[in-house]
């Protein structure tokens, strides 16, 4: 790991929100007197009823309960839109850049208000009300944000489904949360390719029983022909004549705001529930301090609203702070790898927040991504989704940031709501690849496999010892799964599932997942979900999926397969199985390497030893550790001999 230290640049200290002394004082108060600290921070939101009960939380596995501001009342959409109108209604909320470089739009806060009110009234016309679930399967267009905020305005609970997911994944999520309405578009656009969103929805509803689904709202984005059913309604028809006046529903701070599905290590995705008050405060306060955001900044989070980064740092955090954000439909490499730089120059972007995968994709082209690009407007860079390797950090810092922009390398999860470990641009000297220090209220610790806390410079399992306002409250419809997943491994603490090390300067470095969840290009994928898709193919008897180091994606997907008897292994079959996963689950889940084998390493009780498979996939087969419980050690020798990642 790099131990090179980059001091805080002088310009980052000027007019900043925090000095190192401010951070030390505020952090101490946030962990020593959380009720006092968070009551003060909550004043940054507009409340219908100011909360007096600030923190009521328990990590006891017999009674896991997380409540913040529980007697407070507010509306998220009001906080993100209405309260800005009097003084900032004319200010741009979103600069939208289409996949096609010639497509763009400007959405002011006034226009955002009117568009959200119309679709909110449209939803009310369809009978959607407080507590109803609405699925959103949209491209990266402003209407995706309008739909999310419309749900928040009327008290409906949204679940955004990433536009790259398959019909099966759509149906699973719709059925799990019993969504009443689904909002989609005719098609999406990505790198010039048309993504058949409406067709995917049609397939999901035709091939699966989705009894809760009553209506599908379709936004006309590309204008391509789509099939039509009796339960379909065009967005423009629904909103035509709808009023731009839509009184916001008064919500309790602990009412659910959204459900977002994240991969679990035991098969079915988990519907992580975030609530209204604590989440909004957490998203907004982290956006303000992590990015040192100030009015007038042009801020760009290059994520997708289908993931939590898009929820917190495209929609809720920036809008609560009255920010101006860039929203980008396309990919960093289309039409060519200078697209990011061109958008930065075109809109004079000051803050750029993207994923190591995107950084590595651009880095592969050397200096070309910045050829003809000024980049002089940039003052801050950010990284999210997975640990950034020092080589990519250096390229980002020198080539994109011109060796003058601090990098905030943030660690957090769907379940944490927003940033947890992060440098602060005016406070933290940077170490390439380090997530650095905890944000206000976050109390990290490292423990060994038995749960004993480790002190000093060490490596272990990362836990959080107390609650924070943006913490997920439960898994939708399955609180026991929430408890078992996060609170039983190391009782009395939140188990992140990540490993980390702490250096002699108390900087935290994330070392990767310790469970069976992969982090592919910043997207979390459950190995069990991929294995389930693989074994549903008629040629596959058994499957085991592990991650391995991948230059571009961070983690690649390495698949071990046992064929059914009589199946002939061919290149065509391998390609077919790969495409099968792509269709059943998502293009993101497409295997990088598929190794066929007559056997898998199993214990005598029949459990696959994935630890060994991970070592082989990573070419670390000389460090297999204890293999005494293997039923047939010769299987391992064969797998090593035939390994694909040489």
UniProtKB/Swiss-Prot annotation:
Post-translational events: Acetylated. Deacetylation by the SIR2-homolog deacetylase activates the enzyme.
Presence of the UniProt keyword Magnesium in the record: yes
Reactions that this protein is recorded to catalyse: acetate + ATP + CoA = acetyl-CoA + AMP + diphosphate
Coiled coil: none
MF-aspect GO terms: acetate-CoA ligase activity; AMP binding; ATP binding; metal ion binding
EC number(s) reported in the record: 6.2.1.1
A single cellular component GO annotation: cytosol
Function description: Catalyzes the conversion of acetate into acetyl-CoA (AcCoA), an essential intermediate at the junction of anabolic and catabolic pathways. AcsA undergoes a two-step reaction. In the first half reaction, AcsA combines acetate with ATP to form acetyl-adenylate (AcAMP) intermediate. In the second half reaction, it can then transfer the acetyl group from AcAMP to the sulfhydryl group of CoA, forming the product AcCoA.
HAMAP family: Ac_CoA_synth (MF_01123)
Protein name, UniProt field: Acetyl-coenzyme A synthetase
Taxonomic placement: Bacteria, Pseudomonadati, Pseudomonadota, Gammaproteobacteria, Alteromonadales
The gene coding this protein: acsA
């Amino acid at each position: 790991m790099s131990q090179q230290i980059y001091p805080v640049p002088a310009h980052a200290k000027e007019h900043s929100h925090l000095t190192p002394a401010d951070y030390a004082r505020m952090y101490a108060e946030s962990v020593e007197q959380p009720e006092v600290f968070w009551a003060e921070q909550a004043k940054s939101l507009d409340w219908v009823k100011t909360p007096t009960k600030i923190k009521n939380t328990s990590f006891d596995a017999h009674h896991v309960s997380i409540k913040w501001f529980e007697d407070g009342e507010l509306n998220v959409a009001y906080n993100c839109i209405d309260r800005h109108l009097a003084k900032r209604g004319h200010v741009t909320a979103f600069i939208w850049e289409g996949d096609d470089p010639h497509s763009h739009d400007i959405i002011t806060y006034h226009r955002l208000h009117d568009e959200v009110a119309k679709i909110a009234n449209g939803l009310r016309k369809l009978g959607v009300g407080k507590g109803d679930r609405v699925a959103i399967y949209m491209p990266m267009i402003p209407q995706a944000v309008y739909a999310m905020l419309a749900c928040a305005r009327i008290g409906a609970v949204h679940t955004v489904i990433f536009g790259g997911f398959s019909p099966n994944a759509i149906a699973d999520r719709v059925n799990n949360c019993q969504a009443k309405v689904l909002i989609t578009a005719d098609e999406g656009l990505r790198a010039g390719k048309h993504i058949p969103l409406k067709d995917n929805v049609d397939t999901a509803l035709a091939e699966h029983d989705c009894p809760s689904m009553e209506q599908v709202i379709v936004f006309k984005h590309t204008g391509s022909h789509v099939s039509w059913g009796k339960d379909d309604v065009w967005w423009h028809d629904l909103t035509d004549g709808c009023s731009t006046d839509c009184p916001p529903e008064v919500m309790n701070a602990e009412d659910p705001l959204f459900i977002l599905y994240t991969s679990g290590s035991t098969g079915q995705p988990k519907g992580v529930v975030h609530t209204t008050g604590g989440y909004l405060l957490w998203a907004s306060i982290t956006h303000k301090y992590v990015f040192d955001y100030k009015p007038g900044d042009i801020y760009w989070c290059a994520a997708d609203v289908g993931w939590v980064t898009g929820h917190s740092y495209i929609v809720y955090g920036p809008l609560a702070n009255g920010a101006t954000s860039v929203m980008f439909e396309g990919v960093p490499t289309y039409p060519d790898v200078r697209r990011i730089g061109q958008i930065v120059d075109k809109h004079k972007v000051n803050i750029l927040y993207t994923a190591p995968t995107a950084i590595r994709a651009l880095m592969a082209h050397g200096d070309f991504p910045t050829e003809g690009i000024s980049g002089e407007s940039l003052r801050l860079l950010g990284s999210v989704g997975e640990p950034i390797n020092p080589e990519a950090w250096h390229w980002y810092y020198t080539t994109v940031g011109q060796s003058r922009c601090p990098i905030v390398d943030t660690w957090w999860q769907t379940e944490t709501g927003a940033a947890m470990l992060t440098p602060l641009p005016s406070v933290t000297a940077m170490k390439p690849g380090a997530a650095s220090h905890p944000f206000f209220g976050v109390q990290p610790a490292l423990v060994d496999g038995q749960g004993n806390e480790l002190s000093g410079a060490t490596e272990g399992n990362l836990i959080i010892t107390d609650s924070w306002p943006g913490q997920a409250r439960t898994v939708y419809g399955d609180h026991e799964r929430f408890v078992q997943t996060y609170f039983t491994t190391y009782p009395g603490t939140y188990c992140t599932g990540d490993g980390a090390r702490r250096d002699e300067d108390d900087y935290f470095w994330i070392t990767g997942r310790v469970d069976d969840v992969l982090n592919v290009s910043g997207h979390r994928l459950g190995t069990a979900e991929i294995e389930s898709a693989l074994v549903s193919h008629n040629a596959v008897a058994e499957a085991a999926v592990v991650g391995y180091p991948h230059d571009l994606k961070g983690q690649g997907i390495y698949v071990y397969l046992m064929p059914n008897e009589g199946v002939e292994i061919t290149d065509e079959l391998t390609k077919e199985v790969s495409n099968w996963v792509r269709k059943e689950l998502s293009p993101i889940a497409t295997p990088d390497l598929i190794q066929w084998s007559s056997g898998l390493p199993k214990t005598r009780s029949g459990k696959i030893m994935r630890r060994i498979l991970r070592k082989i996939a990573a070419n670390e087969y000389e460090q297999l550790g204890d293999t005494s419980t293997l039923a047939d050690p010769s299987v391992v020798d064969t797998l090593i001999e035939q390994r694909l990642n040489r």
